[in-house]
Design a protein with these regions (language model features):
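Active-site glycine-rich loops that stabilize anionic/oxyanionic intermediates
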Residues: 48-51, 121, 243-244
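Short beta-strand/loop motif that positions the catalytic acidic residue
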Residues: 233, 239-241, 245
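Gly/Ala-rich beta-loop-alpha elbow adjacent to hydrolase catalytic centers
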Residues: 118-123, 127
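Serine-hydrolase catalytic-loop signature spanning alpha/beta hydrolases and amidase-signature enzymes
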Residues: 50-58, 70
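Catalytic active-site module of serine/aspartate enzymes centered on a nucleophile-bearing elbow/loop
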Residues: 263-300
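Conserved alpha/beta-hydrolase
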Residues: 63-87
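Flexible "cap/lid" loop of the alpha/beta hydrolase fold
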Residues: 136-171, 212-219
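Conserved alpha/beta-hydrolase "acid-adjacent" motif
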Residues: 246-255
């Protein structure tokens, strides 16, 4: 439960980035003030593409009941509801990995205690970026998107991303998934009935930019999709992977883990049997939440 402290290396990273460039919303300000007022250990949840912060609502309840205070900030300009998101898809366009990372960075630095952070998919990449800046007391990256230095590109991951990557113009667009695309990329490990319910309840359009950034990260030394895996202030990290995940398969999680093992802090990986990319929101979400909670509890 330490205050946020930033060593010289971390400070240089922050100085060179456009930290907090996005406006923090009134709702996010309320979350920050509430967390600080409780005096409890904060946990910050970071969603990925095609989901909203509300995808963490049940997780927040679990962690609050365990004695933490929680925040689930938006990506910049996220609508509050799925219906609003579907009605105004253009607000998602052109959101990059760097912009979103800096937005969460600005939120975290306003907390009086260094938080634990948990992210899913591109949120799993973002929490590793934030931990690499020394801003996390303990981190869980669930089915994380790849970063520079992570080389595997399984065919299922390419197929999942192809609705975006198949057209270069999508780099600057907001892209929705059809039900069939969502079924393959997110909901392949659940029943047809549950898959359709998940699609209706959670799926929203997403920025195409992060997928292009991740896909080209190993070709671009200046990419925003990079992680400082050696910062001694990174803190403990758990990477989890759903066994049946088509979007971020085990090969990507394992390669991310191997890169993160360069760090001196605790680094662990867990494969969760029979789970797909929707593992944080489907009927088995509680299993993943409990694995994450058990890891966080060991350190804060």
């Amino acid at each position: 439960m330490e205050n946020v402290t930033i060593n010289q290396k971390t400070a240089s990273i922050l100085e060179s980035s456009s930290v907090g460039s996005a406006t923090i919303s009134d709702h996010e300000t309320h979350q920050i003030e509430r967390a600080n007022a409780t005096g409890l250990q904060p946990v910050v949840f970071v969603h990925g593409l095609w989901l909203l912060p509300s995808s963490w609502d049940r997780w927040a309840t679990v962690f609050e009941e365990a004695g933490y205070t929680t925040l689930a900030p938006s990506w910049p300009d996220d609508p509050e509801t799925v219906d609003e998101a579907k009605a105004n898809p253009e607000v998602f366009a052109n959101k990059t990995v760097g912009q979103v990372a800096d937005h969460f960075d600005g939120i975290i630095r306003r907390l009086t205690k260094k938080p634990a952070i948990i992210g899913h998919s591109f949120g799993g990449l973002l929490v590793q970026i934030l931990a690499g800046r020394g801003l996390s007391a303990a981190t869980v990256a669930i089915d994380p998107a790849p970063f520079r230095g992570v080389l595997p590109l399984p065919l299922s991951a390419l197929k999942s991303a192809w609705p975006v990557l198949g057209n270069p113009a999508n780099r600057h667009r907001a892209i929705p998934l059809t039900y069939e695309q969502f079924r393959f990329g997110f909901a392949n490990a659940v029943s047809e009935e549950e898959a359709r319910d998940l699609y209706k309840t959670f799926a929203v359009p997403a920025s195409g930019a992060p997928l292009f950034q991740a896909a080209t990260a190993n070709l671009n030394p200046w990419t925003e999709a990079k992680v400082d895996v050696e910062n001694p202030d990174r803190g403990p990290l758990l990477i989890t992977s759903g066994e049946k995940d088509n979007t971020a398969p085990w090969a990507i999680a394992k390669a991310s883990f191997k890169r993160q093992q360069l760090n001196s802090s605790v680094t662990e990986i867990v494969e969760i049997p029979n789970r797909g990319h929707a593992l944080t929101v489907d009927s088995g979400w509680g299993e993943v939440a409990n694995i994450s909670l058990a890891f966080i509890r060991r350190f804060v």
